[in-house]
Amino acid sequence: MNNKKQQNIQSEKTLTEIFKYNAGGEASEYHIIIHSTKPEDTYEEQLNAVLNTYDYLLTQELKGAVAILKRYFLSDAANQADTLLALTTEGSDCALSIVEQPPLDGTKIALWVYLLTDVQTQVLHNGLFEVKHSAYRHFWGGSAFNRAANSEYQTRLLLNDYVMQLMEQGCKLADNCIRTWFFVQNVDVNYAGVVKARNEVFVTQNLTEKTHYISSTGIDGRHADPKVLVQMDTYAVAGLQPEQIHFLYAPTHLNPTYEYGVSFERGTYVDYGDRRQVFISGTASICLLYTSPSPRD
């Protein structure tokens, strides 16, 4: 049975890529990416085209699905985020992530949405977005930030706050968090602070080289407020058994990340009764064990 489907939908001003996983009678998953195809249009025109396309798809190809995570990629967050938020406030009943990462096609906005069918959702009082299905509770967080003095302090506060959010739901960072995304302003300057804070917080949460880490992205990305040096998206699951979670190791080709001073897994997969979800870290892969066969390579 081929339960995976991919299709592209072209409209006058947008191109949508749709990836669907159909599990029969269980929850179906969608990843969609909506691109503007008119780089010459104003930001407002591109934004409206993307939003109109999304609204249309909800009545057609995505009928019955609910948004779990939306991530908007902007070319100039400082001048664009307020307009986006003003237009999407009523429809923001999911984890919302907004980051300045200009689309490579020269447009001003792109939208990635993760959707599910046959789930119950709610926004928790602590800001996490809860998704219930079967025996599992999934917690998504988008664009968490603060304005502490530097990237180290901001990251430490983000992670400590997240630990408390999880504790309120009977969860632990080490046992339940599956994936994090860190978007770092001027990453070449500020990433060292992120690494230091993450390493130090992880030790307090039993996340060490002897146990395991969390698959993650650490990449350049800006918030609309220049004082925000780090913003964080998160995903955790309650109800998993330890044997359902596995980590990607390839010792003949990739050394452990702690050997070069950072604390993340290169990949994680989670087994459910009807599917396997795979989370690959979105970061540079460094291998200290590589030996070039030729000085020219």
Language-model regions, residue ranges each:
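Catalytic strand-loop segment that frames the active site of acyl-thioester-processing enzymes
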Residues: 23-40, 134-147, 269-289
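Conserved small/polar residues in nucleotide/adenosyl-binding loops
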Residues: 290-297
